[in-house]
Amino acid sequence: MEMQATGLSKAIDKLLFVPLLSLALVGSSVLPVAALEPSAGLAAGAEPAVAIAEEPPAAAASEPLSASAAAPLLRGSVTSLEPFNRQILLKEVELERFAINFRKMNNVQGRWRGWRYFLSQEANAGATAGGLVYQAVERQRVINIANEMFLDKNGKVSYRTRAANRAKLGAGLVPQIVGQTIGAAGSGLELGINFYHEYQARKAGYGPKPSIARVLSIRQEIEDLFAQRQAAALAANLSEADLEIAKAEEAVLKDITSMGLAEYVQFHVGAKRFRAFQDSLYVLDIAKNTVGAVGNLMNLKGLHERRPHYAGPGGVLTLTSGILIIGTPILSRLYGKAVARMHEKSLAKVLDGVEKRDLHKLNEDRNRLLQLVAARTDKSAISPQSCSAQTLALLSTYEQQSNLKQCQLELASREIRDGTRAATENITVGTAVGGTKVTLGICSMISGFRYAQQGHKGNSIFQAGTIAYASGSFLTVGDNIRLRIKDEWNRHRLGKKRQLPMQVLGDRLKALDAIESSLKTCSGKSEKKE
């Protein structure tokens, strides 16, 4: 009887024990493995592995036995917790996969967005610069020779004040209006594409509220599995050494769970902050181009109807457009941060009661588990070549690489996102270009409201604003080209290293699929042998 019980114990140990510390052979962090459903394991009636205490020596057989020693002492093995370990890890894989897919679905930029937006905004800046230069040449012609000589009807030489050619000034306004219309349409197109991607994400179950509910559900399932694991550990009557190993395993599992939840929160907040920032950029871009185009239409109407005072209201609209150019990058960033804070509040329940853990804490718990397993006197159940050990090594490598590459991923994402913006959507260039348009607006207001009947003075003042904004428009043209070249270079450089955001996330999903397959394979083998 004793030999049969001992043989059964060793057979089950060899089948189920997870060599959590065999990772010392591969030098990676430790992740406990999962896959067998608890209901298919211990809860389904499988007997725990036991070790029966040895019989008393023959010399002491005739001595009276105490009540506690009258029956053999049954102790469970830490290997009986393996089904729970695998099941918890399967849930953690599900959590990480959901977080990655959430980021992908809520942060779609597309390969050609940068080029589309560049073409629309470059057309805007180029057409505006061309129209302003055409106007500036005509205004300067009048400034250079303010009075022209002519012969009156009596043949006497006389002089008269020269006036700018209204047809030429109007012709200079037309490309500006067309450019601003193209710019607004380009921003509207990108905004519409964002709305479409948002619709797709919500339809796939990755909207903000459904996503939070899904993550909370996964968290609850993991917590339930932890509770079942703790109950099984207590019922197994583990030895002191095995109980310490079980607690160390649980610490590692909880480290990974905490890190997975924190990563989802980070992805959620980051994706929503950038989407709010980008959408507000497009909305403000539409606003500034629309206001500027209406201001130019007002000036064009004044030229056609010989009403120079229309330059005053037109200047007000031009001034407003310039202020919007200055404020767009600042207001968009503030709006993005405000949206991020709103989502952080709604995500507070995801991390409520969860101890903050990081890679450093995971490594500490791994090292402690390594020491405990190394101190075991019975190492016959540990096989570095077992399915569980290999899966565990894969999990550990994945977790280590994911955390080490997180900063790299964020940097790459920032570089790619920068390439989808126009020059004026950066604070420095936006302030400079917006300032030149504000100058044009002020000059137009002075010319229209104060010097409407003094054409030469009004023209001279208008010319100063025209030259200023033409300079700003050429700055926009040049910086847009710089940003496009920089974006293509970054994509080429990162793509060769497989560090583009979508490449990194795609590789992580493939790794998770391989891990999940390995876990389920281990579970299937265990079920067949049982």
Each predicted region: which residue ranges?
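Membrane-active amphipathic alpha-helices enriched in small hydrophobic residues
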Residues: G114-Q140, R166-Y199, R273-K301, H309-A338, ...
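Terminal, compositionally biased segments
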Residues: L36-L42, E47-A51, E55-P57, S62-E63, ...
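Classical Sec-dependent N-terminal signal peptides that target proteins to the secretory pathway
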Residues: M1-A44
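Interhelical loop segments of eukaryotic multi-pass membrane proteins
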Residues: V142-D152, R202-K209, H304-Y310, E344-A348
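Extended amphipathic alpha-helical interaction segments
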Residues: Q228-L300, G312, V316-L319, I325-P329, ...
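Intrinsically disordered terminal tails
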Residues: A24, K457-S460
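Cytosolic/matrix-facing juxtamembrane and C-terminal tails of multi-pass cellular membrane proteins
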Residues: S66-E82, R86, L90-K91, L95, ...
